[in-house]
Structures are given as structure tokens and as C-alpha cells.
A protein has these predicted regions:
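C-terminal accessory regions
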Residues: 417-450, 456-462, 467-533, 538
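Conserved helicase NTPase motor core
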Residues: 32-33, 39-48, 56, 194-279, ...
């Protein structure tokens, strides 16, 4: 493999003038220590100084760069009442312990719920197709049964709830919701789509009218809140928005209409939820741009590797590791406990089978993985009534799933189909083994499994990155990947930056990183690997593609 230090050095040379906002009036803020006693970096000081002068900020905070602590320092220096918007409940609860008392720490959903509690109390739950059929009139249309129509209607309602649109109309006719819809001809297909749009619009109308008792989901009341044109500026003097790279259009619409000072923090290279409606907020937001590029999570070898990934996307600022943190890129073997990060749930199914005698933990639980395995097998055996997983429930047959995947190449479906095809009807034995593996709490596990999506915000000492990426299998040109698969690169970046100590790259990942280093004809140098580890029981971790 080529060395990547030269790539990082080149990025530094290209980014020499990034401190374009550093000519600020002195505010007697020294560079010694924060209020909590830790040393602030020059980048953190610039952010605090600019915020105190009242500027709207866009802070690009790389992985492990202390974004939350920077926001806390900003909050301590700002006067008036502030709002810290957290991405989820766990982040919000942690933030309450860190931010000063003049800053409210909330999620967008908690604000929206409080504003609408009187009209939605007792109605909020996860909906299913039977709720839709029970609450509004749903009829069969051509080959699409009531359940099929209700399923598409619910998907469209969810897409609308995350959008910035004012109503459900023909704008959504090209939505991903309808990718699998096929009539016998164009006229039938159009009629099916229009009928689903009509039914979704009807449900939304009825569930939002005064006195309605129809059930709604959590994202629905956030949408109701957005449509009410809320004025947060009446309550708050400044807003701190964390993890803004994963904001969806409905939340962005709320924030962009506020006139108070706004400080956005996030890492656009960690945007991995576009399939859920999130957009790259940095492209839509206004404000003075700053970087937090010094990571306090890992050392220089992992930061150099991560810099190669973001540089290939056009990022000119390198991610810098902390020199006195010892992190290594290893090969072949890994100390236990270690965490295996996978692109897909299907790869986790494969890997669980490789370690039958070990204490295992699956981040987020094993239920979703079992649901995927059971639903895939039910589809394979034409047991359609037992297809429960949302990703597979839309298909009427195994062949319909394969036809869809030939066009759209979903990573989970691709690998799941491969595994089931290999095992055939004996795949039911695989399901049994997954159900009866030795699962324990994370702190007791020898091996931890997680999808990269679920690893977001986490960190572990020893990390193995699996190579179950569609972009590896299809061997696309780098230019095509940068054009069509940018989020896959983001996932790789998220994964490699979860490691605090040792990182093991499986075969496909190593080959791909070599291609990235060669991209744009970077100077060919070599990554140095540390002597391979052995696991506690002497077993090696298989790096080859499964």
C-alpha cells in the first residue's frame, strides 16, 4: 500500500489561507485554558471569538475534534438565552450536564411535541399498513392489493414529513417511494402513483385536522410544527445546532427562518443518512466558515488515512491526529475485545457464524438482523405473509427483489441474496445459529458487531473494517464513485475514525485505499504496518472477502 503522509502535506499547502476570518478585534480572550482547565486550540479560539462578535458560524468539525466542547465554550461566552439543538435524546441528556444554565438543551422533536402536546397526546406511535387501511378508505388498484397501497401510502407520508414541502401533491410522483411501482403499462403505473399520492394526502389532511384521533408518528408532529411557521427568535438569542450535516429539509426550513444568531457545527464528510431524508446542510447554510481539524481521538496514522478519503472528495484541509496518541493500522490479526464494523446487516449475519464459541454483542440488538434474515428466507421460499422487514416487504416475490436490486444495487439485498442462494433451504439452520449465539452486554463481549450507521458517534480501542461495499464489488472508477456514491466514501471515513487504538482494514478496503492514494497521481509512498497482533485465543481474523 502507498504511504499517505505526502497526501496530507499537500492538503496543508493547499489550505494555507483557511483562516480567512481571523482578523478579529481583540476581546481579551486568552489562549491559555478553557473554563474547565483544558487547552484550547487556535481553531477553537477563532470560533469562540467570532461567535462573541455576533457572527453566524458554520464550523466544519472533523471526527473527534472537540465540537461539543467548542460549543460549550461558545455558550459560556455568549449572553442572553440560548438553545442547543441535539441530534437525538442521548446527546441531549449528555449536553444538559455540560452546557451553562442559560442554554436550553433540546431535540427538535421535543420542541415540536411541547408546541403540539394538547392535540397529539396519546396518538403518537409507529404506524403500520393496518393503521392506514383502518383510518382511510384504501382500495385495490390494478395488481396492487390494499396492503400494497397502504404500504406505499405510509412510505410517502414519511417522505413528506421529512421534506420542506407544504403539501402532498404530484411533486412527489418521482419520489424514491415509487421506484418499485410497475403497472402493465405507463398508464397503469401513473394511475397507481396518483392514487397513492391521493391517499397519503387524505390521511395527512385527516390526521392534522382539529380534534383528530388518527395515529401519527414522531416525524409527523415535527412536520406539523414546521408548517406552523414557529418563531424561536422570540425565545432565544442564539441557536447552537449540532450534527447539522444530518439535518433533513423540514428542520433546515425551521432554522433558516430564524433571525437570531445561529452557529452550525458538523462534519459534511459524516453525512450518511440521505436515504432517510437528510441533506448536506453546509451547502444551504450561511455564515463565516471555520474548521476544527485537530482530532483528540486518535494519532497520526489514522488521521492520515482519513485525510486521504476526504481529500479525494475535494477537501483541502487535512485531519490532524494527536501526536502522543499511539494508533496503528494493523493486518491479519486483532487483540480482543475488538469491534467489527460492517456496511450491511447481511455481513453481520455472515460474521456471527464465524465466531460460534465467543461472547458476542450486536450494537442496537440482534432483532433487526434476525428480521432481515427471516424475511429474506420467507421471500426465497415464497412465504410472503412472513416477510416483515421493511426493506423487503415491498416485494411480491424473490424474483421481484432480484429485479429491483439489479437496477438499484442495495448493499444489504445484494449480500443477503448471495448468502441465501448459497445455502438454499438450509438457510433456516443459519437463522437458528444466529438466534442461539452467545450474546452478552457490550462490556463483556469478546467481539462487538455494528453497522457503520449505528457506529456513528461511538469509538472503540480496536476496530476491524469489513469490505462489504458495493463500490468494491463493482470496481467503479474513482470519478464515478465521487459522482454517484459519495455517501459510501463518507461511510468509510466514519468507520476508520471510530478507532482509538488499532485499525484493521480487510482486503477490499486496503485495495480501495490504494486506489484513492493513486487518484490524482499523488506521490507514491507507503503506509507502514505494525507487527500483526494475535487474538487472545490465538485465532486470526480472516481478512479475505467472505
Amino acid at each position: 500500500m502507498r504511504k499517505i503522509g505526502a497526501v496530507v502535506k499537500n492538503m496543508e499547502l493547499q489550505c494555507g489561507d483557511y483562516k480567512k476570518h481571523n482578523q478579529l478585534t481583540s476581546i481579551n480572550y486568552t489562549r491559555t485554558d478553557s473554563d474547565d482547565g483544558y487547552q484550547l486550540t487556535d481553531e477553537q479560539i477563532l470560533c469562540v471569538e467570532s461567535a462573541v462578535q455576533g457572527h453566524d458560524l458554520k464550523i466544519k468539525a472533523f471526527a473527534g475534534s472537540g465540537k461539543t466542547s467548542t460549543l460549550v465554550e461558545i455558550a459560556k461566552k455568549l449572553s442572553g438565552r440560548g438553545l442547543y439543538l441535539a441530534y437525538n435524546k442521548s446527546i441531549q441528556l449528555d449536553a444538559v450536564k455540560k452546557f451553562p444554565v442559560h442554554v436550553d438543551c433540546k431535540t427538535a422533536h421535543s420542541i415540536a411535541y411541547a408546541a403540539n402536546a394538547y392535540r397529539i397526546k396519546g396518538r403518537v406511535r409507529n404506524l403500520n399498513v393496518f393503521d392506514i387501511i383502518e383510518c382511510i378508505e384504501i382500495e385495490r388498484i390494478y395488481a396492487y392489493e390494499e396492503n400494497d397501497v397502504a404500504f406505499l401510502t405510509l412510505k410517502l407520508l414519511r417522505i413528506f414529513a421529512n421534506s420542506d414541502r407544504q403539501k402532498i401533491d404530484k411533486y412527489f410522483s418521482t419520489s424514491l417511494v415509487f421506484d418499485t411501482v410497475e403497472g402493465n403499462n405507463f398508464k397503469e403505473t401513473k394511475a397507481i402513483i396518483n392514487y397513492v399520492i391521493n391517499r397519503a394526502s387524505k390521511y395527512w389532511e385527516q390526521c392534522t385536522e382539529e380534534g383528530s384521533i388518527l395515529p401519527i408518528e414522531h416525524d409527523f408532529y415535527l412536520k406539523i410544527y414546521q408548517l406552523s411557521q414557529p418563531d424561536l427568535t422570540a425565545t432565544y438569542d442564539f441557536i447552537l445546532f449540532d450534527e447539522c450535516q444530518d439535518a433533513n429539509p423540514v428542520l433546515l426550513d425551521i432554522l433558516l427562518k430564524q433571525t437570531c444568531q445561529k452557529i452550525y457545527v458538523g462534519d459534511e464528510h459524516q453525512q450518511i443518512y440521505s436515504w432517510r431524508g437528510s441533506v448536506n446542510a453546509f451547502a444551504k447554510l450561511e455564515g463565516a466558515e471555520y474548521y476544527l481539524s485537530q482530532s483528540f481521538r486518535f494519532g497520526e496514522k489514522i488521521s492520515e488515512l482519513a485525510s486521504v478519503i476526504i481529500h479525494s472528495k475535494g477537501e483541502k484541509k487535512p485531519l490532524r491526529g494527536t501526536a502522543n496518541i499511539n494508533t496503528e493500522i494493523v493486518q491479519n490479526c486483532m487483540e480482543r475485545p475488538f469491534t467489527v464494523l460492517c456496511r450491511t446487516n447481511a455481513r453481520i449475519i455472515e460474521k456471527i457464524l464465524r465466531f460460534p464459541e465467543n461472547r458476542l454483542h450486536v450494537v442496537g440488538g440482534v432483532v433487526e438482523i434476525l428480521n432481515l434474515a427471516k424475511s429474506g428466507f420467507a421471500l426465497f421460499t415464497d412465504d410472503i405473509s412472513n416477510v416483515k422487514h421493511l426493506k423487503l416487504k415491498q416485494f411480491k416475490s424473490w424474483n421481484a427483489m432480484l429485479h429491483f436490486n439489479h437496477k438499484y444495487q442495495d448493499p444489504d439485498i445484494t449480500l443477503l441474496a448471495k448468502i441465501i442462494k448459497e445455502h438454499g433451504v438450509s438457510f433456516k439452520n443459519i437463522i437458528y445459529k444466529i438466534e442461539n449465539a452467545n450474546y452478552v452486554e457490550e462490556r463483556l463481549a469478546d467481539i462487538i458487531f455494528s453497522t457503520i450507521h449505528k457506529s456513528k458517534g461511538r469509538e472503540w480501542n480496536n476496530v476491524v473494517l469489513e469490505d462489504d461495499f458495493i463500490i468494491f464489488c463493482n470496481n467503479q472508477e474513482i470519478e464515478e464513485i465521487l459522482l454517484n456514491y459519495i455517501e459510501e466514501l463518507n461511510l468509510i471515513y466514519v468507520a476508520v475514525t471510530r478507532a482509538k487504538g488499532n485499525l484493521l482494514l480487510t482486503k477490499g478496503v486496503k485495495v480501495f485505499i490504494e486506489r484513492l492514494v493513486s487518484y490524482k497521481k499523488q506521490k507514491p509512498l507507503k503506509i507502514e504496518f505494525k507487527e500483526s497482533f494475535r487474538t487472545i485465543d490465538g485465532a486470526s481474523y480472516e481478512c479475505a472477502r467472505a
